[in-house]
């Protein structure tokens, strides 16, 4: 990063916290208040990304008898009180935390919602490589109303494909998406088997696309038939729990691996809808002089990533 900045003498200031930005009164431009004083600018590009503030759903119980924390504040099993753990959310954070806790000897329940679970590696190539050669980084933005689901992939122990059946056979109890709480009881949707089936479908679809690409291009990448072999469905999938008494199960902690949201409270301009989502077209805001970068699916799948954001930066 430092070398790239030096290559064109970018006037970068590091270690600066922005407190607020708002329009100047009586003349064009904006005033930005920072930890190193005020700055005036004619344009603002907000490239702070979508992961600014941890989200815990409103269904979280109000009980003080059990510790609750967001995955953003989880560091290791030793920080948690004794007892079992209910991990809610089975994206990359949730599955890796559940795996680590189970390996540390904890009793773990993992609440699994809708997800994609791509292969970490397939035919000696990383998942990110496959997204590139298959053109998936440049896939157009999701159509309005199309569901966005979390991605379950692990970087632990060198990285590996997430396999929910393997987690269950390892000792993690899988449950469906959490729908609420009733006193000491956690309540789950009866959707566990369907969520796993859909995750399998997304996984197999990528393997099929990769195999077809290898055949078309005559690449010498070894076949990997074992990637299509699944363990049998464990009992927690074939006969899933629909409720769980936390006290009776000895659960002392709930970890909410439920993602993040944006936080634009510092940007005091008329560029947001009623839900405080940026209003823009390909990053060009409805507020003149304000632009956004790094948002999910801003124009394509890669818009949130370093290797994909350049398309949107060039457009702006």
List each model region and its residues.
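Flavin (primarily FAD) cofactor-binding/catalytic cores of flavoenzymes
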Residues: 2-316
């Amino acid at each position: 990063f430092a070398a790239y900045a030096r290559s064109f003498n970018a006037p970068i200031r590091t270690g600066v916290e922005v407190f607020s930005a708002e329009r100047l009164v009586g003349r064009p431009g904006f005033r930005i208040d920072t930890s190193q004083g005020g700055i005036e600018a004619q344009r603002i590009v907000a490239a702070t990304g979508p992961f600014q503030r941890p989200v815990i759903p409103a269904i979280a119980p109000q009980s003080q008898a059990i510790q609750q924390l967001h995955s953003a504040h989880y560091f290791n099993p030793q920080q948690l009180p004794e007892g079992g753990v209910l991990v809610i959310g089975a994206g990359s954070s949730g599955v890796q935390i559940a795996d680590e806790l189970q390996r540390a000897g904890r009793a773990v329940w993992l609440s699994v919602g809708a997800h994609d679970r791509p292969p970490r590696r397939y035919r000696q190539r990383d998942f990110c490589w496959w997204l590139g050669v298959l053109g998936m980084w440049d896939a157009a933005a999701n159509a309005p109303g199309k569901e966005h689901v979390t991605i379950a992939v692990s970087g632990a122990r060198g990285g590996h494909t997430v396999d929910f059946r393997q987690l269950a056979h390892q000792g993690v109890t899988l449950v469906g998406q959490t729908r609420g709480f009733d006193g000491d009881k956690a309540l789950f949707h009866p959707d566990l088997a369907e969520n796993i089936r859909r995750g399998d479908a997304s996984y197999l679809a990528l393997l099929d696309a990769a195999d077809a690409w290898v055949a078309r291009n005559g690449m010498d990448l070894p076949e990997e038939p074992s990637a299509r072999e699944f363990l049998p469905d464990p009992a927690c999938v074939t006969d899933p729990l629909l409720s769980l008494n936390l006290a009776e199960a000895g659960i002392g902690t709930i970890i909410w691996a439920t993602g993040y949201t944006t936080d634009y409270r510092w940007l005091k301009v008329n560029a947001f809808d009623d839900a405080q989502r940026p209003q823009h077209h390909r990053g060009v805001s409805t507020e003149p002089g304000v632009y956004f970068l790094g948002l999910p699916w801003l124009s394509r799948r890669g818009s949130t990533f370093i290797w994909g954001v350049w398309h949107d930066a060039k457009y702006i």
